[in-house]
Amino acid sequence: MYLRSLHLRHFRNYRDQEITFDAPKTILVGENAQGKTNLLEAVELLATLRSRRASRDRELVYQEERQAQIAATVERLGVAHELVMELRSSGRRSLKVDGQVLRRQADFLGQVNAVVFSSLDLELVRGGPEARRNWLDGVLLQLEPAYLGLVEQYRQILRQRNALLKQDPAAAGDKFSQMDFWDAQLATTGSRIMRRRARLLQRLEPLAAHWHRVISGGRETLTLTYRPQVPLPDPQASPEVIQAQFLAEIRAKAAAEHSLGSSLVGPHRDEVELCINGVAARAYGSQGQQRTLVLALKLAELELIEQVVRDPPLLLLDDVLAELDLHRQNQLLEAIQERVQTLVTTTHLGSFDAGWLKAAQILQVQGGQLFPSKTGDGIP
């Protein structure tokens, strides 16, 4: 796929900015807090409908404006599409594809596919389980747009069940009969999420292991293991088998759940274990090794999305390329070649391999405005 153009109105620190992408690689150069990451965030929103930096849409709207707009022209499999996302301070969104307003947000997913690699992604290695769950879910949203509805349904069930757990049994009346209902709902929806996560990781692991071997020169072996909070007998097991296991775990932890007033069983507590040579990756102190691992995960993600949708996704590199040594830069360049459109942000170009700068579109970013870079600008 190819992002032909992007138009940001009242988005973050962009008042009204259009950009046409005219090269496979676009490098955005500027000081911190000028808007480089904001531009990549807009593209990521088109791909996932989620921001990793904002909890509310209000944070995405420029100052006192009431709404922001992200418009893009995207070419997929040789066909151009016009996409529009409107974000309101109230939290209400509207989405359009080729001028048609969409009723469901899930129908927008898949219009843009993107893989993002930023400094935040080092949390995949050194952060808690939530970072790794969010990563898996983000990939699933792009591969299976219907997964969005499943996740939203699970969160709603979890809220209802937690509210019931917090109630005083004496005041809640038929609390326990209600709990049976929500237990069944949690098990049904949670099992569907678990099966999808397990199947995804089965497909990602060999790809990530391959890229990790390539980047590390064959010196290290990477393994990814899904550790669901509910023991999963087999990712291919029937939904009924998994649901029965789920309900058994709920019964085993019933007393603790009622005591704490919180659900202790379900995919909201899953873990993805990352190991290098059989040792938990977080035990490795080297930032170089951590970056190698995350780069392998991102290349696996990129390769899998390309296999499934039959079109290379966009690659968004936010202030990480210059931090990779020349070997890793070259491995990444070799992996994506010219077929993957790449948007890169950086504060300087001095540590870039010449292969990245060759024929790249270089833009200066200053105060929410973009300027074509003159020859030599920003290049020591």
Curated annotation (Swiss-Prot):
Domain of life per record: Bacteria
Cellular component, GO annotation: cytoplasm
Residue positions binding ATP: 30-37
Gene3D superfamilies: P-loop containing nucleotide triphosphate hydrolases, RecF/RecN/SMC, N-terminal domain
Keyword Lyase attached: no
GO function terms (MF aspect): ATP binding; single-stranded DNA binding
Pfam families: SMC_N
Keywords from the named record: ATP-binding, Cytoplasm, DNA damage, DNA repair, DNA replication, DNA-binding, Nucleotide-binding, SOS response
UniProt subcellular location: Cytoplasm
N-terminal signal peptide: none
Keyword Transmembrane helix attached: no
Biological process, per Gene Ontology: DNA replication; DNA synthesis involved in DNA repair; double-strand break repair; SOS response
UniProt similarity note: Belongs to the RecF family.
Free-text function comment from the UniProt entry: The RecF protein is involved in DNA metabolism; it is required for DNA replication and normal SOS inducibility. RecF binds preferentially to single-stranded, linear DNA. It also seems to bind ATP.
Protein name, entry field: DNA replication and repair protein RecF
Organism: Synechococcus sp. (strain JA-2-3B'a(2-13))
